[in-house]
From Swiss-Prot:
The active site is at D342 (nucleophile), E397 (proton donor). This is 1,4-alpha-glucan-branching enzyme. The gene is GLC3. Glycogen-branching enzyme participates in the glycogen biosynthetic process along with glycogenin and glycogen synthase. Generates alpha-1,6-glucosidic branches from alpha-1,4-linked glucose chains, to increase solubility of the glycogen polymer. It comes from Rhizophagus irregularis (strain DAOM 181602 / DAOM 197198 / MUCL 43194). It is found in: Cytoplasm. Transmembrane segments: none annotated. GO terms for biological process: glycogen biosynthetic process. Keywords: Cytoplasm, Glycogen biosynthesis, Glycosyltransferase, Transferase. Its main location: cytoplasm. Belongs to the glycosyl hydrolase 13 family. GlgB subfamily. SMART domains: Aamy (SM00642). It catalyses: Transfers a segment of a (1->4)-alpha-D-glucan chain to a primary hydroxy group in a similar glucan chain. PANTHER family: 1,4-ALPHA-GLUCAN-BRANCHING ENZYME.
Amino acid sequence: MSPTEMISQENYEPGICKIDPWLKPFAPAIKRRLESYKKWVKEINQNEGGYDKFSRGYERFGLNVLPNGDIIYREWAPNAVAASLIGEFNDWDRSKHPMKKDSFGVWEVHIPAKNGIPTIPHNTKIKISMTTPEGECIDRLPAWIKRVTQDLNVSLAYDAIFWNPPQKYQWKNNSPKKPTSLRIYEAHVGISTNEGRVGTYNEFTDNVLKRIKDLGYNAIQLMAIMEHAYYASFGYQVTSFFGVSSRYGTPEELMRLIDTAHGMGLYVLLDVVHSHACKNVLDGLNMFDGSDHCYFHEGGKGRHDLWDSRLFNYGHWEVLRFLLSNLRFFMEEYRFDGFRFDGVTSMMYHHHGIGTGFSGGYHEYFGDTVDEGGVVYLMLANDMLHKLYPRIITVSEDVSGMPGLCLPVEEGGIGFDYRLAMAIPDMWIKLLKEQRDDDWDMGNICWTLTNRRHMEKTIAYAESHDQALVGDKTLAFWLMDKEMYTHMSDMTPLTPIIDRGLALHKMIRLLTHGLGGEGYLNFEGNEFGHPEWLDFPRAGNNNSFHYARRQWNVVDDDLLRYKYLNEFDKAMQHLEEQYGWLSSPQAYISLKHNENKLVAFERGNLLWIFNFHPTQSFADYKIGTEWAGKYSIALNTDRKIFGGHDRIDESISYHSQPHEWDGRKNYIQVYIPCRVALVLSHC
């Protein structure tokens, strides 16, 4: 039965209400969303021929070269009363290539080829020049432009470039099989170099991909790819939505990066920013046709007070075409395997999450504060992507806890595959910042790690790029602080602070990995406890690149202790590949002992034991388990190669006893030293 047929039934109850009966009082609001979604799908089918044609807007709009070398340029600019294409090819003469406007506000010009060669040369500058109803002449970068560059000797504003290389990129590798357990390596191309400068696509391909593969991750999430004028915005102030950042290299060099990753078996996800747009006028979408409301809501509704940016009007036909086509473009042109949607909370609520604390009450998700246009756009985006690309992965960044965010659209959900577990890193930072180790509450830790919605998959992480930014601290820095500058060498004594830091860094990440979700994420460098924070060049730091880089040299130096954390992270990822606990059912926690600071649980045919006690080790400690038989150590955080003390004899096997313990049918007895975690495999 199709969603349309189901919704038409008077007594139809959305599937989400069967999954979570507490949602039944809100069924009318859920059905209203589905009605709105159904209406959009029907109109797209009737007027555009369905998702497939509608989402190929980049083949109709912007500059497109025909097989005979002719160029057709189309632009939606309903407020303009005149328009022309200008550029180096016609000496910026507004009279040479005037455009014609149709009844939908779309401007068009046909530029014949010369002897089969496009009139506009490859890699030359262009603009659209328009006249407003008030008679003002305005020049803009084409909204669908695929490449923009910056010449700081001339202007801070970016230039639109007609990009039509004579040799197209030849793809070598097919996309890999969709991973059943998702282990994401979050990365930023520009900071991925030791040196104090902007890194390149080619450097990332040649130097970083092999690190990611060796560590055992199976997916990469690339940040700051969509073109953004301000480097320090971390890519979140997008100016050209169809352009990829030229500061890292050419489009073909990004294609090579993705192609090479695919050859290594790595999925590549794009951090897509559809939650807002840069307010730049000269090189952005703001005031594109001279009006305040071309792509955005008008007035205050179209502005994000905290981000100082513009907000899309998701309910407009051409805006919807633009955004859905943007997603399709990156799938087709660059062969990305999916998206991490940024700022989903802002898209789903009129208040954008500003000054709002979510209590978890369901009225917060279905009342007047919800922006139905934004929610329905996300439903359409996920529906389109999953219908056209069944192997795609979509991830949402939402702090509100919206029910159904990761349930199918036809069930009344919003259609994402995963949501980020944003409460987990907040918990770890709060513990390290505010509590002594003796005061850590094992029950609260386990509750936060397992507090996720039924049948909605979650990506767990102990820290991401958010915690690395200036003004915050990474886990390693919270744990070891200034001693990272003086005592991370194996040639110096192992101080109590460094010893504690290494131990807890491993345990925090392992517990998060094992208990926190159905996927895992790490921000580049954090796997080895990257020193210092992340700060992009800006006026406030004298435009310094010192903190806008990754110090790979410290993990490559055998004399430094960073290598221990790196080796542990590698072992952890490869163990997950072997046992697949992320794709296993949620763990059964048999032990949360506050006084002893012990946690034990079963997941993925593995028995996990954590001793967070600062000083107390336990001999012959009874650990309950459902499985009878022999156990052996699969992972031990206390190994010397991980910076531990080798206090455990790993040649020993553990045999279960058939007596109930901690609610399990059997138990084993283990030696578990302080600040050590063990993962035991069941033979």
